[in-house]
């Protein structure tokens, strides 16, 4: 993928739309490179309708890649649902509350309700694609 911003391919939009009712996936733009202000070393980062991927992480040709895209699309839906500033405030508040409870960084991050929801979407897409793949292989 180029460093330029681009739309999700039509096939990806068609594949993921049933998993995200109420979200117009044609509005989503993707680009390579995580913004410098993002803490840590994420493979993906969503900001409203824009998704940033670490170099090489944006893969529309693998089940894992499509599942990662679904994870980030879930965050786009969360932004739409809560608004940008409210989403960010709640996200950070949940993280810091988890840290104050004594969780290490990774556990605090993974316990953020927004991340739990995004992982559920990621896993749902992964399972659906694996089932589809199995059915396809059985027909061969």
Describe the predicted segments one by one:
Residues 2-32, 38-48, 83-140:
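Metalloprotease/metallohydrolase-associated module, dominated by Zn2+-dependent proteases
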Residues 49-55:
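Short, aliphatic-rich beta-strand segments
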Residues 55, 77-78, 122:
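Activation segment
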Residues 58-59:
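Short helix-loop capping/hinge motifs at secondary-structure junctions, enriched
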Residues 62-78:
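Short alpha-helix carrying the canonical HExxH Zn2+-binding catalytic motif
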């Amino acid at each position: 993928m180029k460093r330029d911003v681009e739309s999700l391919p039509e096939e990806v939009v068609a594949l993921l739309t049933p998993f995200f009712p109420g979200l117009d996936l044609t509005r989503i733009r993707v680009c390579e490179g995580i913004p410098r202000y993002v803490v840590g070393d994420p493979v993906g980062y969503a900001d409203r309708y824009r998704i940033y991927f670490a170099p090489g992480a944006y893969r529309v040709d693998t089940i894992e890649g499509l599942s990662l895209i679904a994870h980030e699309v879930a965050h786009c839906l969360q932004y739409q649902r809560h608004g940008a500033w409210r989403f960010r405030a709640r996200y950070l508040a949940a993280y810091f509350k988890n840290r104050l409870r004594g969780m290490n960084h990774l556990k605090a991050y993974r316990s953020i309700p927004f991340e739990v929801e995004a992982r559920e979407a990621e896993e749902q897409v992964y399972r659906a694609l694996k089932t589809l793949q199995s059915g396809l292989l059985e027909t061969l």
